[in-house]
Design a protein with these regions (language model features):
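Terminal targeting signals and extreme-terminal segments of soluble enzymes
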Residues: 1-120
Length: 120
């Protein structure tokens, strides 16, 4: 861990630490797992479980959206100065395919890094 107590380490170490930190949170309860976490790229996975599905057996869009929000938020966090916080201002998704089983993967890279906002 860095001196300021943050999770800023190697991308793999940061992902391991983030996986510990999300235990007991919404992302952790859903079963998300970070695989890479850096200021330039974030990757995470979610193994589809029955409780992630809508009544018709398809992965719920809210689970997909939560995974997307989580990786984007983690990327924004990795670019903050110590003591700063981040929240999602806007989030949009187009779901163009159905998933019934397996593992979904999300990756985020920065499109814009500004002082008040960033786009991932």
């Amino acid at each position: 861990m860095s001196q300021d107590g943050s999770i800023r380490r190697t991308p793999e170490e940061a992902a391991d630490r983030a996986n510990q930190l999300i235990q007991g949170t919404f992302a952790g309860v859903l079963g998300m797992e970070f695989t890479l976490l850096s200021s330039d790229r974030v990757e995470a996975t979610l193994k589809v479980r029955q409780e992630h599905k809508q009544p018709w057996g398809i992965l719920h869009g809210g689970a997909v959206m939560t995974l997307a929000d989580t990786v984007a938020g983690a990327g924004a966090y990795m670019n903050l100065a110590p003591g700063q916080e981040t929240v999602t201002v806007e989030l949009k998704i187009n779901l163009i395919g159905a998933v019934r089983e397996g593992v979904i993967r999300a990756e985020a890279t920065p499109l814009h890094r500004g002082k008040p906002t960033s786009i991932w």
